[in-house]
Each structure stands twice: as structure tokens, then as C-alpha cells.
């Protein structure tokens, strides 16, 4: 445990020591609960990292807006563990504010869930910086976004890159920076 220097080391340690133990348990709907193990977390976050690599987006800024969920968590880890900069944005902000923060952060990717489809549509129409829009939803409800699930399925393999612990990995906008 003394060799933990970054987020990836934490996930690797947990997968090695707790493997198939439950890391997350969450409701899918009123009657259905899903579970994810520490191995799932490692494999899924590495699939996100590989998806970024396949899009030539390693090290880029990635905005994420949506309710906290398992796809949100693996996206977060997949970005920071691939040397990128994650920009989590408050899902409850007005769409105009979210779009402004995405532009100010220099994000080249937007990952969103259906609750903020309005933001994805605006970014598609108005952003000059965002190159990819990725939906965290099980079912893709638009033609302009890529599916996170499909990207992960297509990019299942281990991922490793040297991480500079001194490099920026997260941009957090607080109420003081958002108005």
C-alpha cells in the first residue's frame, strides 16, 4: 500500500486485494439491483481509457455532466487514469452555464447522461472545441452522440500509461467560479 501514488494505483490495489468483492451496488429500476466488483471497476475504467486512446483523445480535457452513477464513476477514473483532465460539472446548473463551463475548461469531449440531453444538443450546435459527445445511457437516443457502452465493449483490454503525479487531472468549478 506504500506504493500508491495516484488514482490508478488505488484501483489496482483494490482489484488485486478485493477482486470479485462488491465495490458498488445500485438500483437499475424499482425492482432490480446491479452489483459491480473491484475487478469490474478496474476493467471498465480501463475500457474507458482505451476508448479515449481509440479516439486519439489521451491527455485531453473531458467534461462530464450527469447524475452520479456507475458509468459516471468509470468515466471519471478512465479519464484521470489515462493522463486526461476530468471536468465534473454540476448536473443541476442551467444549460447555458454548463455550456460556458465546458468551453472555459477547453474540454474536447463531453460525456453526459440523458437528464442533460439539452446540454449535449447545445454543445453539438455551438461548440467549436468539443470533438466527441458520448452518452452514458443504456439506449442511445440521438444520432450525434457515441455510446459509452459500445465504446467500452469495443475497447476491452488492459491499459497502462505512465501518470505524472504533478500534472493536472481535475478541473473543479465551485460556486465561486460559476457565479
Question: Residue spans of the language-model regions?
Answer:
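Solvent-exposed alpha-helix faces
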Residues: 46-50, 103-106, 115, 179
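Conserved pre-ATP/AMP-binding loop-to-beta segment of ANL
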Residues: 19-22, 135, 155-173
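Conserved AMP-binding/adenylate-forming core of the ANL superfamily
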Residues: 20, 24-69, 73, 77, ...
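Structural core segment of the AMP-binding/adenylate-forming
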Residues: 81-150
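A short N-terminal helical cap/helix-turn-helix that marks the beginning
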Residues: 2-24
Amino acid at each position: 500500500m506504500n506504493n500508491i501514488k495516484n488514482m490508478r494505483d488505488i484501483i489496482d490495489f483494490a482489484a488485486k486485494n478485493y477482486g470479485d468483492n462488491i465495490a458498488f451496488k445500485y438500483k437499475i429500476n424499482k425492482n432490480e439491483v446491479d452489483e459491480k466488483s473491484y475487478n469490474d471497476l478496474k476493467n471498465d475504467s480501463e475500457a474507458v481509457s482505451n476508448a479515449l486512446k481509440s479516439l486519439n483523445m489521451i491527455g485531453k480535457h473531458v467534461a462530464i455532466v450527469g447524475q452520479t452513477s456507475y458509468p459516471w464513476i468509470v468515466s471519471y477514473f478512465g479519464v484521470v487514469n489515462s493522463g486526461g483532465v476530468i471536468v465534473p460539472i454540476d448536473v443541476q446548473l442551467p444549460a447555458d452555464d454548463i455550456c460556458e463551463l465546458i468551453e472555459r475548461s477547453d474540454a474536447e469531449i463531453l460525456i453526459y447522461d440523458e437528464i442533460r440531453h439539452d446540454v449535449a444538443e447545445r454543445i453539438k450546435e455551438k461548440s467549436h472545441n468539443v470533438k466527441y459527445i458520448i452518452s452514458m445511457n443504456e439506449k442511445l437516443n440521438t444520432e450525434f452522440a457515441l455510446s459509452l457502452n459500445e465504446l467500452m465493449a469495443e475497447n476491452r483490454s488492459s491499459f497502462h500509461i505512465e501518470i505524472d503525479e504533478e500534472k493536472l487531472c481535475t478541473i473543479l468549478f465551485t460556486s465561486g467560479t460559476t457565479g
